[in-house]
Amino acid sequence: MRAARFHGRGDIRIEEIPEPVVRPGTVKIKVDWCGICGTDLHEYVDGPIFCPTPEEPHPMTGETAPVVLGHEFAGTVAELGADIDDLSMGERVTVEPRLVCRSCPPCLAGHHNSCDRAATIGLAGGGGGLAEYIVVDRELVFSLGEVTTEAGALIEPLAVAHHAVGRAEIAPGASAAVFGAGPIGLLIVTVLKATGAGHISVVEPSAGRRRRALDAGADAVIDPLVEKADERIRELTGGAGAEVAFECAGVDSVLAGCVAAVKARGTVVNVAIRSHPATLDMIPLVLKEVRLVGTICYAGDHQPVIDLLNAGKLSVDRFITRRIDLDDLVEGGFQALLDGTGDDIKILVRP
């Protein structure tokens, strides 16, 4: 079968590799669509970060580079392990691509997303969604119900957004500010709207992405190049500031802006993954008793997201801005996202 494999920084190749073989307890999936994630871009530009090197195997998978990329994907059941009877051939499914050890202290406490040895399918090994087929453990497979496989390819980033909103512990009707209207920021807006948040402000310098934020359900958009975001957010919240702010840009000044934008004893959720250590003036955080919260991946969020999609409370089709074939992955996918205007949100790839 054909697959996109990461060989090293700036080196992704479309290659012929053997089809994976079904084992007991596993499911073989024919991949329909796979999204390109910001993490994939980080690997391409700055990696290897989460991918293994040719010399050093990943501690969870034992695999070395090259590895198949792609962790945001959906498709149909192509083959079932002999012991699996709760899925059907041709059924639309998606995958939670997180591999965990189940024996470290975070895992034993039920916080599998913070596993000491965690790995991600499509980065660390175990196959990936940028291939025609993948075989995964049954426990990682979720039926989509009436959700299409195109929308299903966005369930993984939706689960990230859903988990981030859950980490905020935001009360119904509470105000929120989202800094950065990239794919995850826009999906956080969508989840906030679907789960009953109050006034939602989005801070984003790109005019195109500000428009998309309004389409996603934001009540106000702010251009930080034109006005001070924290002052405008206080105006929009009766002078208090937002109950919670989500940092989705990965920029130090934006993290400081989130602290400035929330009310006293408000919450800042750091969503972005940074390539370099962050710096933050702690005095404003201390004086306002701001709660700074981290969030990573998801923990039991895939099924709630699928339920929201099937109930019509979430819609993601508007975020799919382009569809390409596997042969166009580097130029039409990775380079387009790196060199483009920022108007592309989610590019889907058909392997």
Task: Please state what every model-predicted region is.
Residues 139, 146-226, 231:
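Mid-domain Rossmann-like dinucleotide-binding core that forms the NAD(H)/NADP(H) cofactor-binding site
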Residues 256-260, 299-351:
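C-terminal hydrophobic helical "lid"/dimerization subdomain
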Residues 47, 206, 274, 298:
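Residues in the short beta-alpha loop(s) of Rossmann-like NAD(P)-binding domains
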Residues 57-71, 99-179:
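NAD(P)H dinucleotide-binding glycine-rich loop of Rossmann-like/cofactor-binding domains
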Residues 20-34, 49-105, 140, 145-147:
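Glycine-rich beta-strand-centered segment in the early N-terminal region that forms part
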Residues 168, 211-291, 332, 343:
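Glycine-rich cofactor phosphate-binding loops and adjacent beta1-alpha1 units
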